[in-house]
């Protein structure tokens, strides 16, 4: 399979195999007017299998969303067909409006204008909890 190179944009690389669609949805890439390529289960010498997302064009991406889904992913910034920056991600301590609280008793269920805020409570397990009701993010 051949996917063309990127002129200006970014490559989200080293995504754990099977996680790219979740990332695609959370980043809102379906709204992108630029070219987006999603590659699932690409062969990787380091990971065995991995997913990759290529964005050819300008589309704002929240790095905290990527780090929440897969903190081992890397970001490659491409300008004029050349890799100009490589970013490693840090697990975010706080997520705002990235995921919604699923607890029907949470105040965010009735107060629609409230931000959905989750904090990292168990860094070793990647567990986030709602600041209002302490429900775990799914």
Kindly give the residue locations of the regions a language model identified:
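Cys/His-clustered metal-coordination modules, chiefly Zn-binding fingers
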Residues: 84-138
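Interaction interfaces in information-processing and related assembly proteins
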Residues: 1-87
């Amino acid at each position: 399979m051949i996917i063309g190179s990127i002129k200006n944009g970014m490559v989200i690389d080293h995504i754990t195999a099977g996680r790219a669609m979740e990332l695609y949805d959370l980043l809102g890439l379906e709204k992108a007017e630029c070219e987006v390529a999603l590659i699932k289960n690409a062969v990787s010498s380091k990971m065995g299998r991995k997913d990759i997302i290529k964005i050819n064009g300008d589309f704002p991406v929240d790095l905290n969303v990527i780090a929440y889904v897969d903190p081992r992913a890397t970001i490659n910034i491409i300008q004029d067909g050349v890799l100009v920056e490589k970013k490693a991600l840090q697990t975010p301590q706080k997520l705002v409006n990235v995921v919604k609280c699923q607890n029907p008793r949470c105040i965010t269920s009735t107060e629609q204008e409230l931000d959905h805020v989750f904090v990292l409570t168990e860094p070793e397990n990647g567990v986030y909890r709602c600041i209002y009701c302490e429900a775990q993010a799914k």
